[in-house]
């Protein structure tokens, strides 16, 4: 359900200010700055990635690109021959797939965990609903209530409902029983976070202890930056029509061995007949959310969880999200919300642990 513009987060060790005094990332200078560790940049999953390592390890750029390419071949909904695309186009019955690197199965398992944890507010079967509202094609379509009801009948990620996955395979070959022909999966709300975790596992396997990994705005860090300090991350202030050149920071946090992901609705919406329609769809109703939450930032131990929960909180809204955090303190996650109050003014909520992360 993450149809938002990525990069709700900004790394701050190489920044400049534009004419308005806003902080912006100077990526060109970052690439040229030899004092900032080993740097890798590239494109993946329809977005960009940045990997910075402050340890002496062997060059990894080809390995990173190959892993992310294989990740796309497993989970991209835009590559026609990806495992996910083939499953979505499959009519019904037993679908067989090869998952040598376990990317597909890991995404299924992580997605089901967040789906159950959020009581369905995070739902990877939302693809038909997103498509029905025109968000897949970037067209403004408002389906009638009958269409919404028929689309909602295709939702639900409980095991065996629309899909029954068999995790016992041979020679990395697995199968899934697709029970509903028009049911489709969309892992956009969690896959980028999972790909961050995968790259971090690669780095740690090479002995890296100090690194920064960012893919599409989802971030995981460990250890220290080139200045010997904790990694510093900025969180965008929700401003409509903002971009990398005019962004304003709401808060700055310092992290070690943590992941951070932000999801928001303030950049992605369309307006028709004076009504704004958010691109964040509630799978429980089939309609765009109407609450006042503008962005949700989650800090967690792994990026897949942070990514998925950030999307779930955008569906929940501020009150339900705060209740969730208070009732699930065993998860070791922290939350930062930005929302409009009843007077239309922005307010924030920080979990107790999040407050300790703020750069003083």
State what each model feature region is.
Residues 1-15:
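Sec-dependent bacterial lipoprotein signal peptides
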Residues 15-360:
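Mature catalytic core of soluble alpha/beta enzymes
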């Amino acid at each position: 359900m993450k149809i938002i513009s990525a990069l709700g987060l900004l790394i701050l060790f190489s920044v400049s200010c534009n004419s308005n005094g806003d902080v912006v990332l100077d990526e060109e200078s970052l690439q040229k700055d030899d004092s900032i560790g080993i740097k890798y940049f590239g494109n993946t999953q329809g977005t960009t990635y940045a990997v910075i390592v402050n340890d002496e390890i062997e060059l990894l750029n080809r390995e990173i690109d190959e892993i992310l390419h294989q990740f796309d071949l497993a989970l991209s909904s835009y590559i026609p021959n990806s495992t996910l695309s083939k499953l979505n186009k499959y009519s019904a019955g037993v679908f067989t797939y090869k998952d040598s690197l376990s990317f597909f199965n890991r995404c299924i398992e992580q997605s089901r965990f967040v789906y159950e944890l959020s009581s369905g507010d995070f739902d990877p079967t939302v693809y038909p609903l997103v498509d029905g509202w025109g968000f897949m094609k970037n067209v403004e379509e408002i389906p009638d209530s009958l269409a919404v009801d028929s689309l909602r009948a295709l939702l639900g990620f409980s095991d065996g409902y629309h899909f029954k996955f068999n995790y016992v395979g041979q020679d990395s070959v697995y199968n899934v029983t697709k029970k509903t022909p028009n049911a489709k999966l969309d892992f956009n709300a969690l896959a980028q976070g999972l790909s961050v975790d995968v790259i971090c596992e690669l780095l740690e396997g090479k002995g890296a202890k100090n690194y920064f990994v960012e893919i599409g705005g989802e971030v995981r860090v460990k250890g220290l930056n080139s200045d010997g300090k904790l990694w510093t991350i900025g969180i965008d202030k929700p401003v409509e029509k903002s971009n990398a050149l005019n962004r304003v920071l709401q808060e700055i946090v310092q992290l070690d061995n943590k992941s951070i992901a932000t999801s928001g609705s303030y950049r992605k919406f369309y307006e028709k007949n004076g009504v704004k329609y958010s691109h964040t769809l509630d799978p429980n109703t089939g309609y765009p959310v109407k609450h006042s939450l503008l962005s949700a930032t989650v800090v967690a131990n792994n990026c897949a969880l942070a990514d998925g929960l950030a999307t779930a909180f955008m569906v929940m809204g501020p009150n339900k999200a705060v209740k969730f955090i208070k009732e699930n303190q065993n998860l070791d996650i922290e939350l930062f919300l930005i929302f409009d109050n009843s007077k239309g003014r922005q307010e924030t909520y920080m979990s107790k642990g999040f407050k300790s992360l703020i750069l003083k």
